[in-house]
Swiss-Prot record:
Enzyme Commission (EC) number: 3.5.1.2
Pfam families according to UniProt: Glutaminase
Family, similarity comment: Belongs to the glutaminase family.
Annotated residues for binding of substrate: S66, N117, E161, N168, Y192, Y244, V262
Name of the featured protein: Glutaminase
InterPro entries per the UniProt record, alphabetical: Beta-lactam/transpept-like, Glutaminase
Keyword Ribosomal protein: no
Top-level EC class: hydrolase
GO MF assignments: glutaminase activity
Catalytic activity: L-glutamine + H2O = L-glutamate + NH4(+)
Amino acid sequence: MAAVIDNEMLDDILAQVRPLLGQGKVADYIPALASVSGNKLAIAICTVEGQLYQAGDATERFSIQSISKVLSLVAAMRQYEEDEIWQRVGKDPSGQPFNSLLQLEIEQGKPRNPFINAGALVVCDMLQSRLSAPRQRMLEIVRQLSGVSDLSYDANVARSEFEHSARNAAIAWLMKSFGNFHNDVATVLQNYFHYCALKMSCVELARTFLFLADKGYSSHHAQAVVTPMQARQVNALMATSGMYQNAGEFAWRVGLPAKSGVGGGVVAIVPHEMAIAVWSPELDDTGNSLAGVAVLEKLTQRLGRSVY
């Protein structure tokens, strides 16, 4: 019989995984992230019934980085017809590093999916075309979904990323050369880096992403965020592309739709049941949280949960 969730079980899982701390590496290509202590470990679970469970550093905020790509995609889904989005970005795994230009050149400026950097930049370009204040709108979205009114961007992280943005700028200009990028590159990059610099805790992330476990409905402000079909589509993209080139290994070990960020966070969804957020800043070779993935693996084994 599968275990019942409680805080004691989560504490036990973190204790089992804690020996992994020190075996990964904190992201150092963004100086503002390199200063984060690697000795952090956290988990929070929010269920569709409204229960919240947590352990470790679950209320400490960190830079969510690429987890924000799910939120920007959801924002675009609310502004554009389906065909308008998917004619500019694909739905397939890339099998390449998240900041690769090679595949983008070969495939004439159309990114494989919205969760690699190129795809997320196209989505941000689309938001720039439709929203008068894209950064403020994103803050409004996460504040509504989380029920937390003081969520904000980490200006130091956003500035640090912009100062080291040569590769992302190259990606944007390459797509512009193929006609798949319409706005000012620097403006869109600033929006993109601010989204990545959102500071949230595991508790806030689990609450924010609960709508993906509940057919697109957010209980925190009692309305649909996306349609049930759109929620299913986002979960499918997370399952195939949310963990970069490690998606297959993650599906094997954990078996849930998930999205990671180089800040060490991972959000995972058990459809119809719960949203899970874990955090540990040290990364593996593919840019995913080393201990965070291990926590999710042990959790799904304990609970007997998988979408496969």
